[in-house]
C-alpha cells in the first residue's frame, strides 16, 4: 500500500514540476529535418523559467464545435480568408498561390468562432441568399429531427464507453481480489 502511495506521489511530482520546453518544437527551421544552431547556448536549468522568444507564442485554443472539441495551435486572428477555388482542393496541382494547411485550418476555425444568429431570428439579405442557395428554411426542423434520432457520437459516447470500461475493470478487480482472498483462506485453513 505504501509503495503504491509513494509511486503515485512520485508520478504526480514529475508531472506537475515545471519543465523546459522541447527544443525540437522551439527551433522550427525552414527545411524540415535540417539541424539549426541552438537559440539558447546555455543549458536550461530544471527550475529556471524558459527564456521568452522574440515573437509571442501562439497559445493552444480549445474550440467546441457541436459536441466535439478541437485543440488548435496557431493564430486564429489572421484576416486572410481561405480561397474557395479548385486550386485549394487537395487533389489540385500544387501552386505557389495555395495556402498552407495551417492557414486553411485557421480560417476554418475562425469561421466557426464567428457568432451565430438564433434559428428564430429573421435572416439578413446576405443570409437569405445563402438560405435560398442551400434550400428552404422548412427543411431545418426535419434535419434537426433526423440528427436527434441518430445515436450519440463524440464526447458523450466516449465518456459512456469510458464509464463502462471502468465499471468492467472494477468488477474484474473485485473478482480477482475475491479469488486471492479464497486462496489465502485455503492456504491458512490447511
UniProtKB/Swiss-Prot annotation:
Any single Gene Ontology cellular-component annotation: extracellular space
Domain of life: Eukaryota
MF terms (GO), sorted A to Z: corticotropin-releasing hormone activity
UniProt keyword terms in alphabetical order: Amidation, Cleavage on pair of basic residues, Hormone, Secreted, Signal
Region described as Disordered: spans on this chain: 33-57, 116-151
InterPro entries according to UniProt: Corticotropin-releasing_fac_CS, CRF, Urocortin_CRF
PANTHER family: CORTICOLIBERIN, CORTICOLIBERIN/UROCORTIN
Family: Belongs to the sauvagine/corticotropin-releasing factor/urotensin I family.
UniProt-recorded name of the protein: Corticoliberin
Gene source species: Bos taurus
The gene coding this protein: CRH
Amino acid at each position: 500500500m505504501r509503495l503504491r502511495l509513494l509511486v503515485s506521489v512520485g508520478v504526480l511530482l514529475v508531472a506537475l514540476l515545471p519543465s523546459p520546453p522541447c527544443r525540437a518544437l522551439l527551433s522550427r527551421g525552414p527545411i524540415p529535418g535540417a539541424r539549426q544552431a541552438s537559440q539558447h547556448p546555455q543549458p536550461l536549468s530544471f527550475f529556471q523559467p524558459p527564456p521568452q522568444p522574440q515573437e509571442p507564442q501562439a497559445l493552444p485554443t480549445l474550440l467546441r464545435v457541436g459536441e466535439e472539441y478541437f485543440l488548435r495551435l496557431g493564430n486564429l486572428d489572421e484576416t486572410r480568408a481561405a480561397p474557395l477555388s479548385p486550386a485549394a482542393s487537395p487533389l489540385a496541382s500544387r501552386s505557389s498561390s495555395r495556402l498552407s494547411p495551417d492557414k486553411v485550418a485557421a480560417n476554418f476555425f475562425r469561421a466557426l468562432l464567428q457568432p451565430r444568429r438564433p434559428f428564430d431570428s429573421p435572416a439578413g439579405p446576405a443570409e437569405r441568399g445563402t438560405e435560398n442557395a442551400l434550400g428552404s428554411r422548412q427543411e431545418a426542423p426535419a434535419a434537426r429531427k433526423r440528427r436527434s434520432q441518430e445515436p450519440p457520437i463524440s464526447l458523450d459516447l466516449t465518456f459512456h464507453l469510458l464509464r463502462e470500461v471502468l465499471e468492467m475493470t472494477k468488477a474484474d478487480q473485485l473478482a480477482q481480489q475475491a479469488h486471492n482472498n479464497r486462496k489465502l483462506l485455503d492456504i491458512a485453513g490447511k
